[in-house]
C-alpha cells in the first residue's frame, strides 16, 4: 500500500530539482514493492511506499522517481513505446518490464523533507549511501570546522546542484586541473630513463667512439674486443668508474630520492601526511581518481619513512653502544618509530576505500576496507570501514556479509557518531526485505557462524586466507612453467630458410584453445610502474607495496608473495634494475631463472656435474642448435577437466544495473505502467540517447563518474504524456536473474569435444630460448654498439650481485649477455594495455577553444577601435573573405560549439582507450609460430597470461600461423614488407604478400567483350584487381635506409635532450619489438582525431608506379598511374578534412556531409567495395547521422560498414565487428525496431563472448548486451 501526501508548489519544485540531481550521485539498490492505484489529477502528490519507505512523487498521475545514472535503456524503451505504437503487443511487454526494472531501484541520496500524512513511523529515512566526505579527523584544518557543524553529509541547494549537473564534464575539469593531473601522474610514475644518471658527456663519448671503432669491423668477436678496450680506457681516463659503480651499487630508495629532487615537485609537504592532506582536498572537489593517486603515494611514502627511521635508529644504537641511559632512550625511540601509526594507516585505507566506492569499484573497495580492518584494533574509523565494506558487499549482492558489517558498524557508531546511523538502518531494512539466496562463500561463512557464534570465526578465516596467500613455494611456481598445448599442434623443422614451424596434425575447428602459456620472464614498461601489478600485470587502483623497497607494487598479498619467491626477493632494493632498459632487465631475469631451474633440477647430484653442464653450455653457445624441437612431457591433460578460465565482465558503472535480481520472494506481483515525465536530465533526442548509453562510454578507473549530458535546445523544456494503464501479473522467479553477477554462467565453455581434446604439457626450458636466432649479421653497427655497451654494464652488475641473484658463474660473460640482447629484439612479446586518453583529449580541445577565444577577442578589440562604418565594412569584408576560403569556412569556423557534437571528446562518446605496450614477456612455445599477414590464430591476454585460439578451421597439415604486427586487413603491402624487415629481419612471403593483398584493392579500369556467351553484347567491366609491381631488392634497400634514418634521428634526439629532462614515451611510439600488435591502427575505432593513425600510402614517385590487372592483364603506368594516384590523394584529403572538422570542431553542417559523400564517391570509383578507405567513410557518415538525429541513415551506413568489414576479413570472428553490431542494435532500439535490435544484439553478444580482447570496452559492451538480452527474454516471458 502507498499513502499520499499533498505538496505545496515550493516543496514540489524542491523535490523535482532534487530528483533531477540524483542522477549518477546515488547508488543503486535492489527492491520490490507494490503500488496502489494512482491518482490521475493535475496536482503534485507525494507517495510513501509502505514496504520500502521510498518517497515517490507523482505529477499528473505519473511517477517521478530518482533513476540512477545509466538507466537510459529504460528511457530508450519508454520513448520507443510512446512514439511507435505500431508494434502492438510487444510494446506493452517491453513497457511492463521497463516499469518493473525501474521501480525496483531506489536512490539513497536524501531528498527534501515533505509533509507526510499518516506516514508509517517505522519506515527509515533515506540517507546517503556513502559518506561523501573523507574521515573527519584527517581533513586539513581549514576544512575541519565546516564538517563538524553538520551531523551528516549535506546536499547542495537544489538549484545550484541542477546547474552543476547540466554543465558538460570538461567544465568540471579545466585545463589547469588536467595539466596538474598529467604532472601528477608523471611525477608519481617512478619512471627513471634508462641509465639517465650516467654522466652525459661520458655516455656520449662512449657511444661516438664505439660507432667509429666498429664501423669497418665485420667479425663479432673483434667488435666485442674493440668495444671492451674503449670501455675500459674511458672508465680509467674519465674517472667514470665511480659514477658507473655508484649506480650499480645504489639502492632503489636512494635512486628514487635522488631523481625526485631534480624532477617536478609540488607545493605541499613531500611527506605521507602531506600527500594524504592534499588527497583530502581533491576528494572535496570530487576528483576521486586524483585523490586515490595521492592516497596511494601517501601509503608508499609512509613505508619509506618507517624504513628510514628504523635505519637511523639502528645507526644511533651502534654509535651509542647500546649502554646506559642513552642506549635505553634510543631503543625506546626505535620502538616508537617502528610501530605503525594505526590512525594514519587506517585513515589512508578508509579514504582509499571511499574513493573506490565513489568510483563504483565495489570489489576493490571491499578488499581495501578489509586491509584497513586488519590493521585496526579499535580506532575512530573502524565503524566507517565496516560501513563502507558493507556498502561494497551490498552492491556485490553478498547480503549476508553486508548485514554482518552493517550490524558491526551500527554497534560501533552508537558509541561515537550518529551521522551514518540512518543510512545503516536503511540498508539493514532493505536486506531484511530482500530474501535472496546466499552465494557459495556466504553459505560457508554462515555455517561457520552457526557452529560457534561466540568464536572469532572471521578472524580465523582471515588468518587462514592470509596463510594461503603466504604459502607460495617454489614447486607451485614451477607448475606455472609448463605450457599447455593442444595435442593436435605438432612442431617440425622444415628448412634452413623457414626454420621451425607449428603444424596441425589433425583437423582443428574454429575457436579451439591451442596454447596456454605463462611467461618465462617478463617485466613492466617503465611508464606504467605505478599503474599495474608487478606480478600479474593487471591494472590496480589501490596497490600494496613491498615493505623493504617501497617501489614494487601489487594487487594482492598473493601476487606480492608469489613475486617475492619468484624474483623480487633477489632483486629487492637493487636500484640498477629500475633504471636499466627493459631488454637488460629481461636478460638479467632470464639468467636468474636459468640458475634457479638448474639448481632445482640438480638437487642431490654430484658436484662435478656443474662443470660438465658448463662445458655443454659453452658448446651450445658456440654452436647454437637452431633446429631444437621441444618434446612434450610423458603425461597428457584432458582439457575438458582443465578448461581455460574465461573472465566474466564486471560492472564498472551503475548504468547497467537493472536490479531485477534483487526482487523479493513473493511469486507474483502487480504493477501499474505509467510514463515518466521527461526531466532536464533525461535524453530526449537520438543523439543524447545514444550519448548517454554509448557503448564506448566506459567509466575509466582514472576519471570521476561522468555526469548526465545536458539537453539540446530542442529538448530543454520538460514535457509529459500519459498512456493507458495496463495491469499484468508475472512470475518473479523467472525475472530474478535479469541482472548479471559474478555467479552467472554467461560464458559457457563450448561442449564440442573437438574443441577440448587432449593437451600436451611442455616444460619451459632455457635450451629452447638459447636456440633462438640472434641475427648478429642483421643488426646495424649503431644498434650493435649500443647492445655491446649495455652488455658490459650488465656484466659489471652481475659480477657484484652474482650470489644474490643466483646466476651461474659461466653466464656472467659478455658474449652470453649480448646473444640474449640480440635475441630479445625479435622474440619479445609486447603485452598490450588500454589507456584512458580523456585528459589529453580534453586538454587539447580546451587549448583550441582558448586559441579561438583569443582570436575572437583580438578581432573584437580591433573592431572597437574603429568607427561604426569602418566596422561594418570590415565585417562584410571578413564574411566575403571567409566565403572565399574553404579551409576556414565552413569547416573550421563552425558556429556549433565543440560540445555540441555527441562524438566530440568532450561528450564521452569517442573511444576513450588507446592501446599501448604496458609490459614485455618471453613465451618460448608461442615463439615457434611463424608470421603471416593473414594469420589463422587469435591472441588473448589475461594480465601476462597468454592464450592462443584458432581463428577459423585449420585443416590437417596446415601451418599454424600468428601475426607479428602488420596485417593485410589494415596495412598496405609496402608498409608490411618494410616494417617486417626492419623489425624481424626477413622478407615476408606469406600467402597475402604473395598475392599482393591489402586493405584497399583497386578496381581494374579495363573491360572486355564476352564473345563466347554473347558475341553482340556490350563490353563487360573487368572484375580483376590492379596489383602494383614491387621490386624486392629496392624495397630491402629502402628498408635499410629508413632504418638508418630512424637511428640517426634517435641519436640526434638523445644528444639534444638535456640531462635528467626526460618525459614518458608517447603512446604511439615507434618501438615495435612485439610479436602480435594487430589492433593499433584499427579502422573501426578511429573516432578520435588525436589517436587516429591513418596509414595513407606514401606516393613519392607518382609517375613510375606500375600496375597490372590480376585478371585481364591490363597495365597502368606513366600518366595513367599519376592520374590514379592523384585521385586517391584528393579523396584522402577530402575525408581527412571532413572528419577532423566533425570530430574536432563539432561542425555538423551539410557541407561536411557533402564533403564526406564526395570522398565516398571518389573512393567507390577507385577501390573495390571491401576497401578499408570506403569503410572509414561509412563509419564517419554513421557518426554524422547520429549527431544530426538521423537514426535511419546512421543504421544504413553502419550496416554498410559491417558488410564492408566482413567482406574484407573473410569471417566474422572479430571483437571490432562485435562492437559495431552492438552499436547497430542500440540504434535500432532507439528507433523502435525491436526485432532488428534483438538480432543485432544477439550477434554482438555471440561474437564478443568468444573473441573479446582485454580492452575494457569489450567487457562494458558485453555487460550491457547481456542485460538487454535478458530484458528482451523477460519481456517474452511476460507475454506468455
Swiss-Prot record:
TPR repeat start-end pairs: 272-305, 383-416, 1218-1251
Residue span, SET domain: 822-965
Biased composition (Low complexity): 16-25, 117-153, 659-697, 712-726, 854-898, 1042-1053, 1061-1079
Residues at which Zn(2+) 2 binds: 546, 549, 568, 572
Cross-referenced SUPFAM superfamilies: HIT/MYND zinc finger-like (SSF144232), SET domain (SSF82199), TPR-like (SSF48452)
Coiled-coil intervals, chain numbering: 439-468
Cellular component per GO, a single term: nucleus
Mapped zinc finger ranges (MYND-type): 533-572
UniProt: Zn(2+) 1 binding residues: 533, 536, 555, 559
EC number: 2.1.1.-
Listed GO biological process terms: methylation
SMART domains: TPR (SM00028)
Chain positions covered by the region annotation Disordered: 1-35, 111-167, 601-642, 659-726, 854-905, 1039-1079
Keyword tags: Coiled coil, Metal-binding, Methyltransferase, Repeat, S-adenosyl-L-methionine, TPR repeat, Transferase, Zinc, Zinc-finger
Top EC class of this enzyme: transferase
Single GO MF annotation: histone deacetylase binding
Family annotation (InterPro entries): SET-MYND_domain_protein, SET_dom, SET_dom_sf, TPR-like_helical_dom_sf, TPR_rpt, Znf_MYND
Record's function text: Probable methyltransferase.
Family assignment from sequence similarity: Belongs to the class V-like SAM-binding methyltransferase superfamily.
Protein name: SET and MYND domain-containing protein DDB_G0284059
Taxonomic placement: Eukaryota, Amoebozoa, Evosea, Eumycetozoa, Dictyostelia
Amino acid at each position: 500500500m502507498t499513502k499520499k501526501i499533498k505538496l505545496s508548489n515550493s516543496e514540489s519544485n524542491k523535490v523535482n530539482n532534487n530528483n533531477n540531481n540524483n542522477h549518477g550521485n546515488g547508488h543503486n539498490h535492489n527492491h520490490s514493492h507494490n503500488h496502489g492505484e494512482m491518482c490521475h489529477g493535475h496536482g503534485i502528490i507525494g507517495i510513501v511506499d509502505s514496504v520500502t519507505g521510498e518517497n515517490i512523487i507523482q505529477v499528473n498521475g505519473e511517477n517521478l522517481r530518482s533513476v540512477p545514472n545509466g538507466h537510459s535503456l529504460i528511457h530508450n524503451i519508454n520513448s520507443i513505446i510512446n512514439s511507435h505504437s505500431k508494434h502492438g503487443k510487444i510494446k506493452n511487454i517491453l513497457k511492463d518490464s521497463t516499469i518493473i526494472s525501474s521501480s525496483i531501484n531506489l536512490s539513497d541520496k536524501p531528498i527534501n523533507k515533505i509533509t507526510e500524512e499518516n506516514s508509517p513511523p517505522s519506515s527509515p529515512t533515506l540517507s546517503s549511501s556513502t559518506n561523501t566526505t573523507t574521515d573527519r579527523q584527517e581533513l586539513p584544518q581549514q576544512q575541519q570546522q565546516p564538517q563538524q557543524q553538520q551531523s551528516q553529509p549535506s546536499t547542495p541547494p537544489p538549484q545550484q546542484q541542477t546547474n552543476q549537473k547540466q554543465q558538460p564534464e570538461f567544465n568540471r575539469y579545466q585545463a589547469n586541473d588536467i595539466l596538474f593531473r598529467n604532472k601528477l601522474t608523471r611525477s608519481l610514475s617512478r619512471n627513471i630513463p634508462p641509465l639517465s644518471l650516467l654522466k652525459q658527456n661520458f655516455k656520449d663519448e662512449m657511444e661516438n667512439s664505439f660507432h667509429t671503432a666498429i664501423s669497418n669491423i665485420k667479425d663479432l668477436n673483434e667488435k666485442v674486443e674493440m668495444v671492451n678496450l674503449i670501455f675500459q680506457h674511458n672508465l680509467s681516463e674519465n674517472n667514470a668508474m665511480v659514477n658507473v659503480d655508484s649506480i650499480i651499487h645504489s639502492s632503489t630508495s636512494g635512486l628514487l630520492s635522488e631523481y625526485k629532487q631534480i624532477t617536478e615537485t609540488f607545493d605541499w609537504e613531500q611527506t605521507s601526511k602531506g600527500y594524504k592532506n592534499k588527497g583530502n582536498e581533491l576528494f572535496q572537489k570530487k576528483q576521486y581518481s586524483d585523490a586515490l593517486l595521492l592516497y596511494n603515494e601517501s601509503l608508499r611514502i609512509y613505508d619509506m619513512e618507517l624504513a628510514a627511521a628504523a635505519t637511523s635508529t639502528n645507526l644511533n644504537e651502534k654509535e651509542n653502544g647500546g649502554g646506559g641511559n642513552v642506549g635505553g632512550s634510543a631503543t625506546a625511540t626505535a620502538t616508537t618509530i617502528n610501530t605503525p601509526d594505526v590512525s594514519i594507516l587506517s585513515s589512508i585505507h578508509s579514504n582509499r576505500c571511499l574513493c573506490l566506492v565513489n568510483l563504483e569499484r565495489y570489489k576493490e573497495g571491499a578488499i581495501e576496507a578489509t586491509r584497513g580492518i586488519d590493521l585496526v584494533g579499535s580506532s575512530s574509523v573502524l565503524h566507517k570501514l565496516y560501513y563502507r565494506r558493507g556498502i561494497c558487499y551490498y552492491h556485490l549482492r553478498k547480503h549476508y556479509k553486508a548485514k554482518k558489517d552493517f550490524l558491526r558498524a551500527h554497534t560501533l557508531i552508537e558509541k561515537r557518531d550518529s551521522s551514518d546511523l540512518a543510512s545503516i538502518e536503511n540498508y539493514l531494512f532493505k536486506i531484511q526485505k530482500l530474501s535472496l539466496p546466499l552465494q557459495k562463500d556466504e553459505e560457508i561463512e554462515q555455517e561457520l557462524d552457526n557452529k560457534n557464534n561466540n568464536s572469532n570465526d572471521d578472524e580465523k578465516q582471515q588468518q587462514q586466507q592470509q596463510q594461503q596467500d603466504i604459502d607460495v613455494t617454489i614447486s607451485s611456481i614451477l607448475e606455472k612453467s609448463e605450457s599447455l598445448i593442444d595435442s593436435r599442434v605438432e612442431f617440425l623443422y622444415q628448412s634452413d630458410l623457414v626454420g621451425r614451424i607449428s603444424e596441425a596434425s589433425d583437423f582443428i575447428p574454429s575457436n579451439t584453445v591451442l596454447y596456454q602459456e605463462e611467461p618465462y620472464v617478463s617485466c613492466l614498461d617503465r611508464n606504467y610502474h605505478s599503474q599495474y601489478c608487478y606480478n600479474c600485470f593487471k591494472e590496480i587502483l589501490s596497490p600494496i607495496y613491498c615493505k623493504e623497497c617501497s617501489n614494487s607494487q601489487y594487487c594482492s598479498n598473493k601476487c606480492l608473495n608469489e613475486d617475492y619467491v619468484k624474483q623480487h626477493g633477489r632483486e629487492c632494493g637493487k636500484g640498477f634494475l629500475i633504471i636499466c632498459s627493459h631488454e637488460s632487465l629481461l636478460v638479467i631475469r632470464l639468467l636468474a631463472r636459468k640458475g634457479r631451474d638448474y639448481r632445482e633440477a640438480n638437487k642431490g647430484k654430484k658436484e662435478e656435474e656443474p662443470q660438465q653442464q658448463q662445458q655443454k653450455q659453452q658448446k651450445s653457445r658456440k654452436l647454437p642448435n637452431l633446429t631444437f624441437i621441444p618434446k612434450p612431457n610423458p603425461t597428457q591433460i584432458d582439457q575438458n577437466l582443465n578448461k581455460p578460465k574465461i573472465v566474466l565482465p564486471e560492472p564498472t558503472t551503475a548504468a547497467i544495473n537493472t536490479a531485477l535480481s534483487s526482487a523479493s520472494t513473493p511469486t507474483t506481483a502487480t504493477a501499474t505502467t505509467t510514463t515518466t515525465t521527461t526531466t532536464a536530465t533525461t535524453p530526449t533526442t537520438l543523439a543524447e540517447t545514444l550519448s548517454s548509453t554509448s557503448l564506448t562510454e566506459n567509466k575509466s578507473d582514472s576519471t570521476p563518474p561522468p555526469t548526465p549530458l545536458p539537453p539540446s535546445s530542442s529538448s530543454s523544456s520538460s514535457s509529459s504524456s500519459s498512456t493507458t494503464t495496463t495491469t499484468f501479473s508475472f512470475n518473479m522467479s523467472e525475472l530474478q536473474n535479469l541482472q548479471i553477477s559474478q555467479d552467472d554462467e554467461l560464458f559457457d565453455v563450448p561442449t564440442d569435444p573437438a574443441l577440448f581434446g587432449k593437451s600436451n604439457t611442455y616444460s619451459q626450458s632455457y635450451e629452447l630460448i638459447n636456440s633462438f636466432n640472434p641475427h648478429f649479421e642483421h643488426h646495424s653497427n649503431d644498434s650493435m654498439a649500443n647492445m655491446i655497451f649495455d652488455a658490459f654494464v650488465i656484466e659489471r652488475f652481475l659480477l657484484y650481485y652474482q650470489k644474490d641473484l643466483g646466476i651461474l658463474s659461466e653466464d656472467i660473460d659478455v658474449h652470453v649477455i649480448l646473444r640474449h640482447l640480440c635475441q630479445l629484439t625479435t622474440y619479445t612479446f609486447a603485452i598490450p594495455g588500454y589507456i584512458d586518453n580523456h585528459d589529453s583529449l580534453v586538454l587539447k580541445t580546451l587549448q583550441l577553444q582558448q586559441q579561438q577565444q583569443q582570436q575572437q577577442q583580438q578581432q573584437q578589440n580591433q573592431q572597437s577601435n574603429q568607427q561604426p562604418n569602418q566596422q561594418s565594412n570590415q565585417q562584410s569584408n571578413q564574411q566575403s573573405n571567409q566565403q572565399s576560403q574553404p579551409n576556414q569556412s565552413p569547416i573550421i569556423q563552425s558556429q556549433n560549439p565543440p560540445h555540441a557534437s555527441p562524438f566530440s571528446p568532450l561528450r564521452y562518446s569517442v573511444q576513450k582507450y588507446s592501446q599501448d605496450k604496458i609490459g614485455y614477456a618471453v613465451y618460448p612455445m608461442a615463439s615457434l609460430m611463424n608470421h603471416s599477414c593473414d594469420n589463422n590464430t587469435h591472441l588473448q591476454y589475461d594480465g601476462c597470461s597468454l592464450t592462443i585460439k584458432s581463428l577459423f578451421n585449420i585443416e590437417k597439415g596446415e601451418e599454424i600461423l600468428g601475426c607479428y604486427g602488420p596485417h593485410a586487413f589494415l596495412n598496405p603491402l609496402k608498409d608490411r614488407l618494410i616494417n617486417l624487415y626492419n623489425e624481424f629481419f626477413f622478407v615476408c612471403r606469406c600467402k597475402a604478400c604473395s598475392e599482393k593483398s591489402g586493405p584497399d584493392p583497386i578496381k581494374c579500369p579495363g573491360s572486355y567483350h564476352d564473345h563466347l556467351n554473347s558475341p553482340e553484347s556490350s563490353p563487360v567491366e573487368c572484375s580483376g584487381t590492379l596489383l602494383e609491381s614491387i621490386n624486392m631488392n629496392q624495397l630491402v634497400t629502402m628498408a635499410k635506409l629508413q632504418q638508418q634514418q630512424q637511428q640517426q634521428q634517435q641519436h640526434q634526439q638523445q644528444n639534444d635532450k638535456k640531462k635528467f629532462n626526460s618525459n614518458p614515451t608517447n603512446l604511439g611510439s615507434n618501438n615495435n619489438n612485439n610479436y602480435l600488435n594487430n589492433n593499433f591502427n584499427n579502422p573501426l575505432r578511429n573516432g578520435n582525431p588525436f589517436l587516429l593513425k591513418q596509414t595513407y600510402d606514401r606516393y613519392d614517385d607518382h609517375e613510375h608506379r606500375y600496375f597490372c590487372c590480376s585478371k585481364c592483364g591490363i597495365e597502368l603506368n606513366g600518366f595513367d598511374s599519376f592520374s590514379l594516384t592523384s585521385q586517391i590523394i584528393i579523396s584522402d584529403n577530402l575525408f581527412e578534412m571532413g572528419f577532423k572538422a566533425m570530430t574536432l570542431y563539432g561542425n555538423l553542417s551539410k557541407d561536411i556531409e557533402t564533403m564526406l559523400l564526395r570522398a565516398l564517391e571518389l573512393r567507390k570509383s577507385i577501390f573495390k567495395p571491401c576497401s578499408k578507405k570506403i569503410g572509414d567513410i561509412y563509419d564517419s557518415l554513421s557518426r554524422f547521422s547520429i549527431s544530426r538525429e538521423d537514426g535511419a541513415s546512421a543504421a544504413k551506413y553502419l550496416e554498410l560498414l559491417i558488410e564492408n568489414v566482413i567482406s574484407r576479413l573473410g569471417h566474422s570472428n572479430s571483437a571490432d565487428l562485435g562492437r559495431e553490431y552492438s552499436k547497430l542494435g542500440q540504434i535500432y532500439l532507439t528507433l523502435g525496431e525491436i526485432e532488428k535490435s534483438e538480432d543485432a544484439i544477439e550477434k554482438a553478444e555471440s561474437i564478443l563472448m568468444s573473441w573479446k580482447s582485454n580492452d575494457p570496452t569489450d567487457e562494458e559492451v558485453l555487460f550491457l548486451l547481456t542485460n538487454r538480452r535478458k530484458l528482451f527474454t523477460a519481456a517474452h516471458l511476460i507475454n506468455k
